[in-house]
């Protein structure tokens, strides 16, 4: 068994309708690759994980936030990081996430490393 975790999204993603937006992204990505997923059902998890990451990225872009769950741990005896360097952003609603999806997909397409 494998566990996939995405810590990309800002806290502002916890808003009404955001789960519906995620469900739509997952459904759209799965539908686009239907035959491929029928041939290899193990790819469903990767497709869903990609949708979750894209959802979080779009939320971060909409909120103008670089906040995410996976922070470098603070260890005893190490210099403190300047927390003010992290942009908290601003509250968003589900339609803000939808509006940011094209930019999120563009960013992913321009930074992707495709395997042959």
Task: Please report, for each region that a protein language model flagged, where it lies by residue.
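Small-residue (G/A/S/T)-rich helix-start motifs and N-terminal tracts that mark the onset
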Residues: 1-116
């Amino acid at each position: 068994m494998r566990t996939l975790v995405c810590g990309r999204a800002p806290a502002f993603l916890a808003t009404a309708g955001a789960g519906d937006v995620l469900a739509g992204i997952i459904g759209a990505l799965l539908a686009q690759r239907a035959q491929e997923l029928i041939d290899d059902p193990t790819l469903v998890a990767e497709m869903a994980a990609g949708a979750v990451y894209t959802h979080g990225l779009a939320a971060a872009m909409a909120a103008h936030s670089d906040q995410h769950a996976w922070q470098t741990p603070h260890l005893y005896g190490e210099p403190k990081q300047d927390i003010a360097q992290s942009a908290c952003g601003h509250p968003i609603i589900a339609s803000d996430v939808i509006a940011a999806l094209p930019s999120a997909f563009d960013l992913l397409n321009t930074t992707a490393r495709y395997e042959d």
